[in-house]
């Protein structure tokens, strides 16, 4: 087993996380490594987390925000939990988007958190419900105030 990097927060996400990348260190101590990419699919994020784990690059806290760009299955959530099984703090973020799979993805995430008690939920979907002003007109990507709120919620979820 490769040791984790103490004091490092590893984050993997898509363009929503990318929109907050400049704010993600706010309220956090230690090193923040965020790898967020436009149109990232769940399987690519899982591959990255597996690579970080296997090479000793993974922090002792991990935040995952995937599922905006396609389905996230129960099997993939279980795989995620398995990859991160030795990580003391794991947070998975729900999605907010205009796609038909949004509710299915969020249900998978909520069920996964119930199945894996060591995984925490950051319910971005619920947090954004009263704050349409945090998002651009596409209902998904972050305005500056949304990026600040996202970063604050991420920091809070890690405490």
Feature-to-residue mapping (PLM):
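Short conserved AdoMet
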Residues: 57, 85, 114
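A short helix->loop->beta-strand "cap" motif at the edges of active sites that frequently abuts
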Residues: 86-89, 118-119
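Conserved SGNH/GDSL esterase-like catalytic core that processes O-acyl groups on lipids
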Residues: 2-79, 97-107
């Amino acid at each position: 087993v490769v040791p984790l990097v103490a004091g490092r927060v590893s984050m993997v996400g898509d363009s929503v996380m990318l929109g907050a990348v400049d704010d993600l260190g706010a309220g956090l101590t230690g090193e923040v490594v965020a790898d967020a990419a436009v149109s990232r699919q769940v399987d690519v994020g899982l591959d990255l987390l597996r690579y970080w784990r296997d090479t000793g690059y993974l922090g002792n806290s991990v935040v995952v925000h995937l599922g905006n760009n396609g389905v996230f299955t129960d099997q993939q959530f279980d795989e995620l939990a398995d990859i991160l099984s030795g990580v003391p703090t794991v947070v998975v973020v729900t999605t907010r988007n205009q796609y038909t799979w949004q509710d299915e993805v969020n249900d998978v995430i909520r069920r996964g958190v119930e199945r894996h008690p060591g995984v925490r939920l950051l319910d971005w979907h619920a947090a954004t419900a009263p704050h349409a002003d945090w998002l651009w007109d596409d209902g998904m990507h972050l305005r500056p105030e949304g990026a600040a709120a996202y970063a604050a919620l991420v920091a809070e979820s890690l405490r």
